[in-house]
Amino acid sequence: MASSAVVNAEEFDSAGVKIHYEIKGAGEPVILIHGLYASAKLNWDLPGVTKELAKQYRVIALDNRGHGESGRPAADSEYGEKMAGDIIRLMDHLHLTNARVVGYSLGGMIAMKLVVQHPERVRSVVLGGMGWFRADMPGLHYWEKARDEDNMFVPAACLRAMSKLGVTAAEVKAVRVPVVMIVGDQDPLLQACVAPMHKLRPDWPEHIIKGAGHMDCVFKADFKEQLKAALEERKD
C-alpha cells in the first residue's frame, strides 16, 4: 500500500496566476477539483477523501484560481474556461500525459469543460454533486449579475464568469471518456443537473447517496466508497 504522506505542497504559475496544489500518495494520478467557495483542504482533506484515495493513487488536489491559497485575479476574463486551462497547465507542470479527474460541484463543471476541450488528457471523470451545467440554465444570468461584490471566499468575477463553463447537449453526447456521477438524494442539483445529464447519457452510471445534501455529501462514507469504486471500475 502506498504511503499517504504529503509528497509535495507547492505552487506554480498558470498563465500569470499562482495556483497552489498538494500531492499525496503514489500511483496512478488522480486530480481533485473542489467546489465553489471551498478549497482543496475544505472539499477533500477535511472529509477524508484525500487520505482515502492516497492509499492507492497519486492524489493531486489544487486550489482553483480565486480560492484558497491560489491567486485571485479581478477580471471576469480570468475565470470560466481558464479554470479548466489551469488543470491542463498543472498537468504540464507535473509532466503528466493524462490523469483521472474528480470534480465536485463547480469542480464538476470544470471537469466537464476539461473533457470536452481536452479529451486526450483525461482518462476518466467522476462528477460529484454536478451533472449537466448549461450556459442557459434558468436564473443563471440573474445569479451572475447579482454577484457584484467580492467576498472572503471568492472574487465576484469568478461568479460572473460561471456561464463560460457550460457545455452543450451535443458536446455531452460527443464525450467518449468514461464518466460516473455521484450525488446526494437531498441535493437540489440531482433534479436540476444530474437527472438531465443521465437522460442525455444513460450509459453514464449514476450513484445516489442516501441522506446526503449538496454540502455534506463528501463527508458520507458511502460517497468515498462509491468514489473509489468509480475510479476502479473505470480503469482500462
Please place each PLM-identified region on the residue numbering:
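Short beta-strand/loop motif that positions the catalytic acidic residue
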Residues: V175, M181-V183
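Active-site loop/oxyanion-hole signature of alpha/beta-hydrolase fold enzymes
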Residues: K51, A61-R100
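Catalytic histidine-centered segment of alpha/beta-hydrolase-like enzymes
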Residues: A212-D222
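N-terminal cap/lid segment of alpha/beta-hydrolase-fold proteins
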Residues: A5-K18
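Active-site nucleophile elbow and catalytic-triad environment of alpha/beta-hydrolase enzymes
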Residues: P155-E171, L189
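Conserved HGGG/HGGXW glycine-rich cap/lid loop of the alpha/beta-hydrolase fold
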Residues: V17-E69
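Conserved loop-alpha-helix segment in the C-terminal half of the alpha/beta-hydrolase fold
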Residues: K51, D185-K210
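Conserved hydrolase catalytic core segment
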Residues: T97-R134
